[in-house]
């Protein structure tokens, strides 16, 4: 009987050890996938300098509509820096401390961005009624030739006030004509999982930096011509 009990204890110890090893492998695999996704996202936007950050807190609720990251002014983070995760745009930095920053996501109902499809500009906004579906709303789309359809890719526009150009927001999931017969509204499915965010990439240049650089380049070109 004692021998059987001893064997059982040994088997239990082996099972516990294997379970621990298996959990470690799962964690390692999850971490590898996360790092691979971050790398792929970084490679999508090589034209912009970026820094990785970890989310350290969020507002109450299921959604990451406002959250805090572990990077701040000491890392080059500034207000209005754009933030990425998964496969697209997450939001924008609204407040910065030395070693932290607050991000307001695009699903927040106070957020809006000028965006562009392959056909025309429109305004994308957070919508509380659409959050549970992982969707955003868009409006002010002038699509006179009816070319914008479900599945259309939406990115930030060069005329957006605070978002740099070309950041992926999502795909059109619905589009309908307004009663004025001039503009259209609809919804967009975002590629970002706003319920399970953990890490983000922060673009460390602002839209205004790009505007200033373009203005300076234009001035230099004019001076050279003279």
Question: Where in this protein do the model-derived segments appear?
Answer:
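N-terminal membrane-targeting segments
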Residues: 1-6, 10-12, 17
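A secondary-structure micro-motif
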Residues: 3, 19, 24, 34-226
